[in-house]
Amino acid sequence: MNVREPNETVDMDHIFGTLRSELLRLTVDFGLGAEEVVVTTPLTPTEAIGNPEDRDYPIITGRETMLQAVVRDAAGQAFTDMAGEYSASVQEIANMPLTNNFRRAVFAATLNAVVRYAGLVDVSRHCKDEAPRRCAEEVGTWIAERFGFEDESLTPNNDLRILIVGFQPRLIERMAASYHVRVTDLDAANVGGEH
């Protein structure tokens, strides 16, 4: 695992290049190159996350929408601030220039669908209703069991730093209760604030 120093920047082109390489590898390994991907958007908030009691999710407040890509029978999703419909082969999507948020969301949703199809992940769609709160607790437990405690006394490891990509309110609440958390988000309303 490569660990970066705290002040070291992350090159998004490098990250997407790595993801592109993996998507192309999976495309070859599973014979998906010519397989058509159909991206439908926007999913309604109810289709995307159900009807959770908490109403501060960006898709509910209207700041984001969700794309869904389907590869064979596997679906993958990605949040975006640019809505649209799209249809292309997995190979075309894997090689397209990622010049705007719509294209990046199509790429991410397709990658999520492909890794789901390949059996590398069990879930590639957003959880619904009250599941985001349960999911945050499960993620918190998973992190604590593997990385989060300094010793057997269950003292939180206050040196553990967690990065959350995208504004996920319940996950942020759960992680911030025990750890140092940084959140990246494209929505300027979420930048620089404390939640």
Model-derived regions: residue spans:
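Electropositive, gly/pro-rich neighborhoods at or near active sites that engage anionic ligands
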Residues: N2-P169
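Histidine/lysine/aspartate-rich catalytic loop segments that bind and position anionic ligands
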Residues: F167-E194
